[in-house]
Amino acid sequence: MSIRRPDPRYPGGETPLDEDPLASAFWIRGFRREDASAVREVVFGVLAEFGLAPDHADTDVDLSDVEIHYLVPGGGFWVVEDGRGRIVGTCGLWLDPDDPARCELRKMYLLPDWRGRGLGGQLLEAALAHARSTGRTRVELETNRAMTAAIGLYESRGFREIEGETCARCDRLFALDLK
């Protein structure tokens, strides 16, 4: 028997416990329209955890319609779903319509209890594979210096910090040239 403890950071109010096979099971799959609300909860919850504010008018407008901003142009958007059907992670790949070589990794977030399980690396690999399949040769991403674990993941996969403009809540820009 497992005991649940309330956790406001986790949609549904429950924290997954390793002793509960349904709570600790997961899979990565493509975004579905019915995921939209849960995706926003994950993204905005993680932003709040790091003291960062959502920007519904600019940086986060893409979450108003994931299909239009990511899927229709040929990009991708993935979610991590736990064994109970709850969304616990997100990752998007936006294709730059003005530069056929360039794309952006966006909205890569995992709820706290799901970090450190290799899921970030799996999400990143899914996005990079998709970028390659579309013929893109450069992946860029913006992040915030407070997200040290994410930065470590990006650097371990070959991303390097570059100069350039970032959105208001981000202060670091990285790029990876695909082979």
Name each region found by the language model.
Residues 3-4, 8, 28, 83, ...:
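Short, intrinsically disordered low-complexity segments
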Residues 7-10, 20:
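Intrinsic-disorder-associated, low-complexity terminal segments enriched in Asp/Asn/His/Tyr and depleted
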Residues 2-3, 18:
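The identity of the second residue at the extreme N-terminus of proteins
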